[in-house]
Amino acid sequence: MIIVGDIGNTETKICLVNSKNIIIKRVILLTKKINHSSLNKSLLGLNLKNKSINKCLFCSVVPKKFNAVKIFFKKVYKIKCHELKKLNLNKLIKIKVNYKQIGSDRLANAISIINNKDNFIILDFGTATTFDVLIKNTYHGGVIAPGVKLSLDTLTDKASQIPKINLKKTNRVIGLNTISAVRAGFFWGYEGLIDNIVNLIKKETKMSFKIIITGGFSGLFKNSIKTKVTLNKDITIKGLIRATTLIK
């Protein structure tokens, strides 16, 4: 069995994967709360002490928290954890930019779906909204825009008369009150941002792409984006599973 994990700015996912590369158990915890105690409590259900773990691989955009995870697994379970960007990724994917400046999760996403025939744009609704461009088997860079939830939380925190709201689809553009106006602004604003950036990428590269979407708000925008898209919620984890072949 193997362990793979995605340490994001907001959430951390840790998955137990069997020999057929199927996720059999997963835990999710808040990244900011990661410490020895929270990891010990969260991972009890995985029953790791009674399992043979061959490999452990994480992608992390929060180095301090990965270090805490690494120390925990080594101390409690005698398991050595690797970080994705420390592996020789050139065996799986060609990277045209300075990979040290690419989020580890974005590289995992790319590794998950890359092949020698298709071009992809991966749209990830995380703390930031990111677009990653893959042409054949090469990562060509991407776009980073403000995240939906981060932007919404910032607005409601800074504007005293705008209440906390749950973002959901709306058919109206013109809001009839504060809440519906904010919902319209975010829903149609991000829908326009997404379509525009995808079209600009196509124009700049003069190529066609398959669009993969993932992350927290992917379900909300799946049917409103004008371009045909495929939803892949576990793309990051699947990329990590694929990358474990690099661990000897």
From Swiss-Prot:
<dbReference type="InterPro" id="IPR043129">
    <property type="entry name" value="ATPase_NBD"/>
</dbReference>
<dbReference type="GO" id="GO:0015937">
    <property type="term" value="P:coenzyme A biosynthetic process"/>
</dbReference>
<keyword id="KW-0418">Kinase</keyword>
<keyword id="KW-0808">Transferase</keyword>
<feature type="binding site">
    <location>
        <begin position="6"/>
        <end position="13"/>
    </location>
    <ligand>
        <name>ATP</name>
    </ligand>
</feature>
<dbReference type="InterPro" id="IPR004619">
    <property type="entry name" value="Type_III_PanK"/>
</dbReference>
<keyword id="KW-0547">Nucleotide-binding</keyword>
<keyword id="KW-0173">Coenzyme A biosynthesis</keyword>
<dbReference type="GO" id="GO:0004594">
    <property type="term" value="F:pantothenate kinase activity"/>
</dbReference>
<dbReference type="GO" id="GO:0005524">
    <property type="term" value="F:ATP binding"/>
</dbReference>
<feature type="active site" description="Proton acceptor">
    <location>
        <position position="105"/>
    </location>
</feature>
<comment type="subunit">
    <text>Homodimer.</text>
</comment>
<keyword id="KW-0630">Potassium</keyword>
<comment type="similarity">
    <text>Belongs to the type III pantothenate kinase family.</text>
</comment>
<feature type="binding site">
    <location>
        <begin position="103"/>
        <end position="106"/>
    </location>
    <ligand>
        <name>substrate</name>
    </ligand>
</feature>
<dbReference type="GO" id="GO:0046872">
    <property type="term" value="F:metal ion binding"/>
</dbReference>
<feature type="binding site">
    <location>
        <position position="127"/>
    </location>
    <ligand>
        <name>ATP</name>
    </ligand>
</feature>
<feature type="binding site">
    <location>
        <position position="124"/>
    </location>
    <ligand>
        <name>K(+)</name>
    </ligand>
</feature>
<keyword id="KW-0479">Metal-binding</keyword>
<comment type="function">
    <text>Catalyzes the phosphorylation of pantothenate (Pan), the first step in CoA biosynthesis.</text>
</comment>
<keyword id="KW-0963">Cytoplasm</keyword>
<dbReference type="GO" id="GO:0005737">
    <property type="term" value="C:cytoplasm"/>
</dbReference>
<comment type="pathway">
    <text>Cofactor biosynthesis; coenzyme A biosynthesis; CoA from (R)-pantothenate: step 1/5.</text>
</comment>
<keyword id="KW-0067">ATP-binding</keyword>
<protein>
    <recommendedName>
        <fullName>Type III pantothenate kinase</fullName>
        <ecNumber>2.7.1.33</ecNumber>
    </recommendedName>
</protein>
<feature type="binding site">
    <location>
        <position position="178"/>
    </location>
    <ligand>
        <name>substrate</name>
    </ligand>
</feature>
<dbReference type="Pfam" id="PF03309">
    <property type="entry name" value="Pan_kinase"/>
</dbReference>
